[in-house]
């Protein structure tokens, strides 16, 4: 099975942006989210990873804009950012996206998260944003500024709740073009009992080939952001490299 690539469109203040290590204020702007998403579709993407950064950081929302973008795309969309209650979840699913990512809510409101997973199954994935501090794997929430507990304890709970998919990010790698944390991906895939999507750090076609080596271990896909925007490789090149 070939690795699924999900080009990312991160949206802040109505613009497509990329951050460094997820930090607010580190944005580089790349124009219209609609144009970015349609460009990835035209380049052969099967999925687009669409993120509302303002909602993730709790400083507003781009909900209507994101709904328009999802409506215009013919490919599948994974929608993420600030989905922390029924109202936000219902609105996100109503866009017609294929699935949503829960992040902070999975850490701060386990009961609600369990209920969302029970109700929507495959349409709900959980984002595990990991920071390795002195050897400990800590989870980060609220746009990566709050501590969300121990990765392995939270993963055990989510596994018991029947979570269908995990998006795993090493936050120290995201937006840095320094290569993915392959060890972390393999460790999570080894205990998750569900498919894992890699996020953060991809800088080259070799990085994607290395992630693709983990498909047999349970890594299903990779989100690619800055490397595409920075011109390290094209999406058609990336698709060819992993298929």
Curated annotation (Swiss-Prot):
Pathway annotation: Amino-acid biosynthesis; L-histidine biosynthesis; L-histidine from 5-phospho-alpha-D-ribose 1-diphosphate: step 4/9; Amino-acid biosynthesis; L-tryptophan biosynthesis; L-tryptophan from chorismate: step 3/5
Species assigned in the record: Mycobacteroides abscessus (strain ATCC 19977 / DSM 44196 / CCUG 20993 / CIP 104536 / JCM 13569 / NCTC 13031 / TMC 1543 / L948)
EC number of this enzyme: 5.3.1.16, 5.3.1.24
Protein name as catalogued: Phosphoribosyl isomerase A
Location of the active site: 10, 129
Role description: Involved in both the histidine and tryptophan biosynthetic pathways.
Catalysed reaction equations from the record: 1-(5-phospho-beta-D-ribosyl)-5-[(5-phospho-beta-D-ribosylamino)methylideneamino]imidazole-4-carboxamide = 5-[(5-phospho-1-deoxy-D-ribulos-1-ylimino)methylamino]-1-(5-phospho-beta-D-ribosyl)imidazole-4-carboxamide; N-(5-phospho-beta-D-ribosyl)anthranilate = 1-(2-carboxyphenylamino)-1-deoxy-D-ribulose 5-phosphate
CDD domains: HisA
Gene that encodes it: priA
Assigned GO CC terms: cytoplasm
InterPro entries: Aldolase_TIM, His_biosynth, HisA/PriA_Actinobacteria, Isoase_HisA-like, Isoase_HisA-like_bact, RibuloseP-bd_barrel
Subcellular location: Cytoplasm
Keywords per UniProt: Amino-acid biosynthesis, Aromatic amino acid biosynthesis, Cytoplasm, Histidine biosynthesis, Isomerase, Tryptophan biosynthesis
GO MF annotation list: 1-(5-phosphoribosyl)-5-[(5-phosphoribosylamino)methylideneamino]imidazole-4-carboxamide isomerase activity; phosphoribosylanthranilate isomerase activity
The family this protein is said to belong to: Belongs to the HisA/HisF family.
Entry's Gene Ontology BP terms: L-histidine biosynthetic process; L-tryptophan biosynthetic process
């Amino acid at each position: 099975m070939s690795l699924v690539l999900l080009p990312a469109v991160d949206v802040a203040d109505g613009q497509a942006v990329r951050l460094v290590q997820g930090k607010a204020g580190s944005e580089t702007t790349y124009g219209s989210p609609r144009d970015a998403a349609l460009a990835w579709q035209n380049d052969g993407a099967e999925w687009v990873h669409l993120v509302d950064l303002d909602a993730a950081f709790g400083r507003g929302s781009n909900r209507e804009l994101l709904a328009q973008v999802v409506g215009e795309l013919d490919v599948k969309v994974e929608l993420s950012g600030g989905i922390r209650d029924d109202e936000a979840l219902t609105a996100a699913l109503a866009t017609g996206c294929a699935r949503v990512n829960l992040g902070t809510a999975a850490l701060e409101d386990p009961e609600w998260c369990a209920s969302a997973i029970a109700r929507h199954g495959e349409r709900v994935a959980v984002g595990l944003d990991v920071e390795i501090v002195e050897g400990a794997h800590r989870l980060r929430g609220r746009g990566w500024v709050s501590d969300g507990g121990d990765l392995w304890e939270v993963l055990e709970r989510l596994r018991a709740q029947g979570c269908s998919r995990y998006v795993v990010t090493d936050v120290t790698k995201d937006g840095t073009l320094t290569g993915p944390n392959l060890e972390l991906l393999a460790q999570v895939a080894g205990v998750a009992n569900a498919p894992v999507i890699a996020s953060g750090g991809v800088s080259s076609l070799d990085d994607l080939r290395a992630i693709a080596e983990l498909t047999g271990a349970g890594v299903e896909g990779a989100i690619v952001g800055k490397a595409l925007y920075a011109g390290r490789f094209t999406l058609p090149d990336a698709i060819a490299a992993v298929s």
